[in-house]
Amino acid sequence: MTALYYTYYPSPVGRLLILSDGESITHIDFEKEQYAPNPKWHKQDELPVFQKVRLAFERYFNGEVECFSNIPLKPEGTAFQQAIWQALREIDYGELSTYGELALRINNPKAVRAVGGAVGSNPISIIIPCHRILGKDRTLTGFGGGLEAKRFLLQLEKIPYIDKGTENTKPRFFKKYHE
């Protein structure tokens, strides 16, 4: 069994737990209130891959568009999940997609529900950008980090969305982070 290492990143959307096998990132998750690292994981803040991720997050949260392309990722999942996660990575900064559009991207237009399940099980939040997925009418849908975090990320990237019937296009939280 491969050893897993972890560190944290204090992002503006909450503390992120980052896991690595020592070479690649395997998970990035929003730390939950009752969340405790697995005792088999090793705390290691200085891994080169963790340093790359920290720098990429600093750039991302400061509004830089291309930050994550040099981060080695190794998410574990089925072939279907892997296809969806790869399709998510092809959605550029500032763009949005829907579950239906993702199903079309993988040439399986009837798999919308399965696509939703794969998006929901994304193990590498933000870098595999599941926050860029909205309902077919641009409405907010669920997000592992919570809707407030999703709003922040969408506003950071200036992605317009509809929240409770109101269109939001202004990056109001972006300014807050920089003050």
UniProtKB/Swiss-Prot annotation:
SUPFAM superfamilies: Methylated DNA-protein cysteine methyltransferase domain, Methylated DNA-protein cysteine methyltransferase, C-terminal domain
Miscellaneous notes: This enzyme catalyzes only one turnover and therefore is not strictly catalytic. According to one definition, an enzyme is a biocatalyst that acts repeatedly and over many reaction cycles.
Localisation per UniProt entry: Cytoplasm
Name this polypeptide is given: Methylated-DNA--protein-cysteine methyltransferase
Role: Involved in the cellular defense against the biological effects of O6-methylguanine (O6-MeG) and O4-methylthymine (O4-MeT) in DNA. Repairs the methylated nucleobase in DNA by stoichiometrically transferring the methyl group to a cysteine residue in the enzyme. This is a suicide reaction: the enzyme is irreversibly inactivated.
Transmembrane segments: none
InterPro entries: MethylDNA_cys_MeTrfase_AS, MethylDNA_cys_MeTrfase_DNA-bd, MethylDNA_cys_MeTrfase_DNAb, MethylG_MeTrfase_N, MGMT, MGMT_N_sf, WH-like_DNA-bd_sf
PANTHER family reported in the protein's UniProt record: METHYLATED-DNA--PROTEIN-CYSTEINE METHYLTRANSFERASE (PTHR10815:SF5)
Taxonomic lineage: Bacteria, Pseudomonadati, Pseudomonadota, Gammaproteobacteria, Pasteurellales
Gene name per UniProt: ogt
Record-level Gene Ontology MF annotations: methylated-DNA-[protein]-cysteine S-methyltransferase activity
Keywords per UniProt: Cytoplasm, DNA damage, DNA repair, Methyltransferase, Transferase
Family matches, as CDD domains: ATase (cd06445)
Residues annotated as signal peptide: none
Protein's UniProt keywords contain Iron-sulfur: no
